[in-house]
């Protein structure tokens, strides 16, 4: 088993749902205040791309939010709304702590249609990213079973469809839930500027556990009023070979041509998304592995993660108490308008 890929400095924290949440001072720096924190039942004013009316964020049919854990600023907060000149973002706490919307210069960049919790916005993956073969893994000499969320496999972790809680205006937290056989939790922090959005994640363990984390954004291929379809510029050094079940193995092979639903590593430079005549976005991350999914006709996914799919069964990172697993992702954009 591999050691954690990086170590962090001393953390300070507070107890969230029985878990000590460490706010690593090297990671969670102060960020600009959000414009709004929207409570349950309040009406949310439209973001710039919505064209008027009101907008309700949260999956239909979600249960009422449970009582907040100690340290949460308000158990009724459902949405964080961040803004900067020319940019607005919504973070939906009810729908898995995801970025539900990112509007730049009046245009939405993310898929917002909601066929299911794995199909929209940009959601966090924890305590595992990607598929886990047959929804099981062995740790400490014991076979651990997971919920088969993509039968017969498990996929994308236990926090993407559960309710998060606001810790402050830019920070949210959740425990790992009943479908994970270890005790721990996740903290996310967000920072928005006029030309970038940064997401930081920490997974905290109350006991040694294998884990990986990452993000799964859905970027729209076509944006109304722009000149053409989204282009992806990426140069991976290697690709994890997939087996007959479609799950990444430990074997590294030369990258195959598109379409992709594959995990890559050793990228020569950060991936770049380009909407011709509108916007260019560079995706930066300290994650070593990237899943890229190009098959959908209306969107594509570029997913930084700390380990490849099925890492719990191959070469798991073991997270220790007091030594959180952390990752950072930044979307940085510039205008291509003439």
Predicted regions and their residues:
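Extreme N-terminal basic, low-complexity initiation segments
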Residues: 1-15, 21, 32
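Beta-strand-rich N-terminal accessory domains
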Residues: 55-144, 269-285, 323-337
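Active-site/ligand-binding surface loops and adjacent short beta/alpha elements
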Residues: 56-68, 208-210, 217-286
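Extended, loop-rich substrate-binding clefts of extracytoplasmic carbohydrate-active enzymes
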Residues: 57, 74, 142, 147-194
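Acidic, contiguous internal or C-terminal segments within carbohydrate-active enzymes
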Residues: 174-224
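Active-site pocket scaffolds in enzymes
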Residues: 279-338
């Amino acid at each position: 088993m591999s050691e954690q890929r990086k170590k962090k400095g001393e953390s300070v924290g507070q107890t969230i749902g029985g878990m000590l949440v460490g706010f690593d001072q090297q990671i969670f720096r102060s960020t600009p205040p959000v414009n709004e924190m929207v409570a349950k039942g309040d009406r949310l004013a439209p973001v710039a791309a919505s064209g008027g009316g009101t907008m309700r964020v949260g999956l239909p049919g979600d249960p009422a939010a449970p009582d907040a854990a100690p340290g949460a600023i308000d158990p009724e907060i459902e949405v964080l709304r961040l803004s900067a000149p020319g940019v607005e973002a919504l973070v939906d706490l009810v729908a898995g702590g995801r970025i539900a919307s990112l509007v730049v210069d009046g245009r939405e960049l993310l898929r917002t249609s909601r066929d299911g919790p794995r199909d929209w916005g940009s959601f966090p993956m924890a305590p595992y990213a990607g598929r886990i073969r047959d929804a099981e893994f062995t740790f400490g000499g014991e076979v651990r079973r997971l919920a088969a969320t993509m039968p017969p496999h498990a996929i994308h972790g236990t926090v993407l469809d559960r309710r998060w809680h606001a810790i402050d205006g830019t920070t949210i937290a959740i425990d790992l839930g009943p479908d994970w056989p270890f005790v721990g939790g996740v903290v996310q922090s967000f920072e928005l500027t006029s030309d970038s959005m940064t997401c930081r994640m920490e997974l905290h363990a109350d006991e040694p556990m294998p884990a990986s984390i990452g993000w799964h954004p859905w970027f729209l291929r076509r944006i109304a009023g722009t000149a053409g379809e989204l282009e992806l510029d990426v140069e991976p050094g290697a690709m994890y070979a997939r087996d007959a079940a479609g799950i990444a193995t430990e074997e590294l092979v030369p990258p195959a041509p598109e379409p992709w639903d594959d995990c890559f590593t050793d990228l020569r430079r950060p991936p770049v998304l380009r909407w011709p005549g509108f916007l260019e976005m560079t995706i930066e991350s300290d994650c070593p592995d990237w899943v890229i999914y190009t098959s959908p006709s209306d969107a594509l996914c570029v997913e930084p993660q700390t380990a490849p799919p099925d890492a719990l069964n191959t070469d798991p990172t073991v997270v220790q108490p007091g030594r959180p697993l952390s990752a950072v992702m930044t979307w940085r954009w510039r205008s291509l308008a003439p």
